[in-house]
């Protein structure tokens, strides 16, 4: 009895079997759109993601503002810790300091915030940058409200206090602007 020989193997060409390729890609989850509307060309790019999607498109001047903020917070913190009388005198024009402890505590808090600002300067993570900008905006807003309340209580309106209030409003506006700019969704390229 003669053994039956198997039929010759037929090679499939990918150009001729498009339906098979489509089914394979669908099973692998490749080629379709994800939630963000991106089309992945391979499973690897789908798993790893597209790094353009995660890169922060920084608004013009953001890093300069972060640097200025870090220097500002550090400088005022050191001045409040080392020279509390002079800092109080510069803001409130000759009003007598009753205790240096609250001013030094203020300096310690500012020094802590400045460390966060310095670390945020070197990160590329969008969430961290936004949180530090929000922290700045909240700090400057609270400082504006506290100084305004003190001004209303004491009635001492000096040029230093008015300059401080105007600068705090400007700093709030800049921080909020960058906060929203960093949070914007990037445009599709």
UniProtKB/Swiss-Prot annotation:
Membrane-spanning intervals of the chain: 64-84, 109-129, 131-151, 160-180
Annotated keywords: Membrane, Phosphoprotein, Transmembrane, Transmembrane helix
Extracellular side: 85-108, 152-159
Top-level taxon: Eukaryota
Cited Pfam families: p53-inducible11
Membrane topology type: Multi-pass membrane protein
Cytoplasmic side stretches: 1-63, 130, 181-189
Classification via InterPro entries: TP53I11
Entry annotated with the keyword Phosphoprotein: yes
Entry protein name: Tumor protein p53-inducible protein 11
Lineage of the organism: Eukaryota, Metazoa, Chordata, Craniata, Vertebrata
């Amino acid at each position: 009895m003669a053994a039956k020989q198997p039929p010759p193997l037929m090679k499939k060409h990918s150009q001729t079997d498009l339906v098979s390729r489509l089914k394979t890609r669908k099973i692998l989850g490749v080629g379709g759109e994800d939630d963000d509307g991106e089309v992945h060309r391979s499973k690897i790019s789908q798993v790893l993601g597209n790094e353009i999607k995660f890169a922060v498109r920084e608004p013009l001047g953001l890093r300069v503002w972060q640097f200025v903020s870090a220097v500002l917070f550090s400088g005022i913190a050191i001045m409040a810790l080392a020279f509390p009388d002079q800092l109080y005198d510069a803001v409130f024009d000759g009003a007598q300091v009753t205790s240096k402890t609250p001013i030094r505590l203020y300096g310690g808090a500012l020094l802590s915030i400045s460390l966060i600002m310095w670390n945020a300067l070197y990160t590329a993570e969008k969430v961290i940058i936004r949180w530090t900008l929000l922290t700045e905006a909240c700090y400057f807003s609270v400082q504006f409200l506290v100084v305004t309340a003190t001004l209303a209580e004491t009635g001492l309106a000096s040029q230093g206090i008015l300059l401080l209030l105007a600068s705090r409003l400007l700093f709030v506006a800049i921080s909020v602007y960058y906060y929203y700019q960093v949070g914007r969704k990037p445009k599709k390229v």
